[in-house]
């Protein structure tokens, strides 16, 4: 699904980590979006190094330099203002003409906190995570048509897992009717976990990420109920964090309103991948493993050989690059928001 804007959308990225950096790389290739500023508390030299070299995705094809004296990150000769301001209200968004802030720090997850970007002069804010309050959530391919530029100044792009799960459920629900379901995501570890055993508010996440399968919570299934309200309260799930650096997989089991066959299910996904959810959802017919999906831009890649059906009880499985795929949707959401300014 391609969102083309008819104006140049000026983007600022707040937080230049595992989502901020790929979002920058994706936006840098757009003709209708421009990253004009990056704000992160890390020093500029380190930021430039981490943008150029990535353990998961390899060396960035663009040349990365920096101007320490004038505080610019320079990518293929293009200068991007670099800031290290901890308080969003003090950022120069007005002076830089920022249209959309991508809030990627993981620290500002409520309207009250994100409002500070608007006070600083930004026109819109998109959170790259599920919100901690009633901030509206929009998922491309699901409910983006409900976005109202007149009132939706602060929105959430949901989580990587919700962006994978929701299109899968949409196909099932529109073709067969979903009654209720449970989801398990086998998810690559993230920086919210510990490299070695160390205190954490979640005692399981306190354990060494590279040595354990770590059961933990996820709000992804419940968030689907926010963007598909008729399913609210009917979905839930857990996450299993595993010792892989990137790419995750959702296993969704549900009951449908009628009995179906595996072929009916897979045909529905094939059709959606070619039409309604093109560029959002894809299908895979081969015998692949997680690293085969690294760098895949889709929200969900349904693994058709893993589909199962027993009457109206079904299992469907979808892969997703929890960094690159999600970051594509984040930038596309910024394009959509920018187009409606």
Regions found by a protein language model. Name each.
Residues 6-206, 308, 332, 340:
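N-terminal Rossmann-like NAD(P) cofactor-binding subdomain of oxidoreductases
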Residues 14, 18, 42-45, 96, ...:
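Conserved active-site and cofactor/substrate-binding residues in soluble primary-metabolism enzymes
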Residues 73, 138-140, 154, 196, ...:
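Short clusters of hydrophobic/aromatic residues that line enzyme substrate/ligand-binding pockets
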Residues 151-152, 208-210, 247-251, 313-315:
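Short, solvent-exposed beta-strand edge segments and adjacent coil->beta transition regions
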Residues 175-239, 254:
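Catalytic core of tubulin tyrosine ligase-like
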Residues 237, 249-341:
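C-terminal active-site/capping subdomain that shapes the small-molecule cofactor and substrate pocket
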Residues 241-245:
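AMP-binding (ANL) adenylation modules
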């Amino acid at each position: 699904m391609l969102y083309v804007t008819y104006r140049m959308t000026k983007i600022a990225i707040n937080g230049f980590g595992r989502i901020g950096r790929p979002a920058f790389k994706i936006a840098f290739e757009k003709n209708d979006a421009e990253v004009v500023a990056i704000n992160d508390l890390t020093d500029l030299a380190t930021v430039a190094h981490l943008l150029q070299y990535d353990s998961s995705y390899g060396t960035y094809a663009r040349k990365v330099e920096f101007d320490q004296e004038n505080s610019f990150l320079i990518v293929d000769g293009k200068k991007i203002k670099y800031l290290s301001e901890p308080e969003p209200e003090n950022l120069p968004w007005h002076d830089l003409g920022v249209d959309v802030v991508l809030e990627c720090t993981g620290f500002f997850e409520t309207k009250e906190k994100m409002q500070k970007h608007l006070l600083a002069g930004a026109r819109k804010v998109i959170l790259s995570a599920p919100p901690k309050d009633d901030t509206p959530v929009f998922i491309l391919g699901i409910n983006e048509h409900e976005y109202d530029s007149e009132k939706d100044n602060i929105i959430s792009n949901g989580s990587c897992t919700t962006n994978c799960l929701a299109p899968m459920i949409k196909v099932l629900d529109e073709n067969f009717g979903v009654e209720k379901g449970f989801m398990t995501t086998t998810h690559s570890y993230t920086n919210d976990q510990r490299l070695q055993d160390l205190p954490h508010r979640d005692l399981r996440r306190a354990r060494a990420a590279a040595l354990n399968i770590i059961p933990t919570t996820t709000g992804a299934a419940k968030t689907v109920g926010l963007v598909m309200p008729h399913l609210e309260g009917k979905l839930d799930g857990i996450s299993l964090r595993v010792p892989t650096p990137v790419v995750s997989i959702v296993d969704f089991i549900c009951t449908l309103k009628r009995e179906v066959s595996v072929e009916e299910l897979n045909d529905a996904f094939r059709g959606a991948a070619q039409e309604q959810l093109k560029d959002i959802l894809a299908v895979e017919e081969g015998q692949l493993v997680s690293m085969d999906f690294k760098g895949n831009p889709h929200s969900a890649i349904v693994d058709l050989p893993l589909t199962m059906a027993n009457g109206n009880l079904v299992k469907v499985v979808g892969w997703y690059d929890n960094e690159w795929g999600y970051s594509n949707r984040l930038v596309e959401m910024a394009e959509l928001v920018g187009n409606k300014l």
